[in-house]
């Protein structure tokens, strides 16, 4: 297999000021493209340090990717370092400079004087378009080896790298499918599928679980075994299809918005313990405005009463964290917004506020269209985990409801 190395550049990485998300992303992607990543290194904004690392790694790998250090300031030294190691000149690309200036004009009234540095191109390099930011990337071929310079911000790097994947794919490239589940525990899923997953040695199986994406079943094999894996996925879906919410990069909120559009339904949400988290997840999806009317964050009991019409008697008798309260929240929300489907959440996120009857992590979620579907949960974890799980489970329940399940 071909070998690859990654150099992430930036003193802020060495000082722990930002997470090195680029290294994680690139390692995963390069593995799928058929490379063995032999080294990931981080160096500061220092010309000698960058140059030495480039010189060393170029002797060992077929593909070298450098991230960061492509901005316009004096400490953006990646171009200079690579040019120095390769003994090539840096030339100002006037056409590229004009494009960079036009891009900057869309967002800023003044163009920095030092912006010319971003238009310096290493002799023989191919310029890589940056669809998000102003710093272009560069690609060079050196004695059969590929050197790629990419900007540091992940939101810029990811689409630029994705545009290169077809060119970088090797004969050892992998084929991978990730199946995503939320309301089924990892151990239960694995037990349900053990006869399919572990009666073969062609597909590598890995399960991962967290409170944001739920359980992810990652299936990986070589590209030549694609048909085998596709058949395996069909068998898995025959057993677990009703629990599946997404495949590969699909997010729960994207699936829910798509289902709402397909069924021509509008949505409104009323949140207490999640504090707008559910609304935020929904509006993160492009096109959500077609189906999402809005949300109410009714954190206090007064707001629950005055905005959503929850009765004083209900709050005194059952409390804000109760089946009765969330049902009245959705009923009031429906009157307020006229949405087809209303969802409400109320719970105890902690660390205080729990009782023996309703410990920290107790959460009620209600879905109301023509009748109520109310569920009680006892989530574990810290405050943020409980809030996140509440919002995600509300989406999962809504997904199941929209898919036509009688029970969520």
Swiss-Prot record:
UniProt name for this protein: CinA-like protein
Organism: Thermotoga sp. (strain RQ2)
Origin: domain of life: Bacteria
Family: Belongs to the CinA family.
InterPro entries registered for this protein in UniProt: CinA, CinA-like_C, CinA_C, CinA_KH, Competence-induced_CinA, MoaB/Mog-like_dom_sf, MoaB/Mog_dom
Gene3D superfamilies: 3.30.70.2860, CinA-like (3.90.950.20), MoaB/Mog-like domain (3.40.980.10)
HAMAP family registered for this protein in UniProt: CinA_B
SMART domains reported for this sequence: MoCF_biosynth
Phylogenetic classification of the source organism: Bacteria, Thermotogati, Thermotogota, Thermotogae, Thermotogales
